[in-house]
Amino acid sequence: MSSALPDARRLDYHYIAMQTGFWAMFAAVCAYQAALLTARGFTNGEAGMLIAVRCLAGIVCQPALGSFADRHPGIPLRRIVSLSLVLSLAASLVFLLFPMGMAGTIAVLVVMGGFEISSYPLMDAMAIQFISLGVPIRYSLGRGIGSFSYAVVCIFLVTDTVHCPAHCLCHSLRS
């Protein structure tokens, strides 16, 4: 990390944008992955196995990516996180746009799980690095807005899927 500390406000905006993008991307695939898989012809058992493979890829890749980051301190965490998220986004787009068989789906879900799930602890580590250096990053605000983006994306995906206007959904939640 360089000796010049970044502007705290600018850093907050970047951190909030990163959290928002991560959780929106996570919601777009993860919240409905079982429905996506069964809609593509996989059985419930196969869908469960595929989801487990995705999670297992995250469990395996998370310590590997963290170890890589520790062994290469010259590579900023933001680059590792950015590359992880770009790879995961590309895999997510392939998954959403191109239906495929079991082998292709496993390959795409391994990339998605390995990089998307592994990037979140590194985002936390970035925030902790700045906090340790005395930069007053608003971690809780970024995390809260990220969670809000997850909820918003889920609502918009549901309203688009069931053709229900968002105000009807909000009204039913209020009742």
Q: How would you label these PLM feature ranges?
A:
Residues 2-55:
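Helix-loop boundary and gating motifs at the non-cytosolic
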Residues 127-138:
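Paired intracellular helix-loop junctions of major facilitator superfamily
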Residues 58-59, 137-158:
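Glycine-rich segments within core transmembrane alpha-helices of 12-TM secondary carriers
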Residues 60-75, 161-162:
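Helix-to-loop junctions at the C-terminal end of transmembrane segments
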Residues 167-175:
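Symmetry-related core transmembrane helices of the 12-TM Major Facilitator Superfamily/SLC fold
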Residues 20, 91-92, 98-120, 126:
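Hydrophobic core of transmembrane alpha-helices in multi-pass small-molecule transporters
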Residues 26, 55-62, 116, 150:
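Residue-level signal for conserved functional micro-sites within the alpha-helical transmembrane segments
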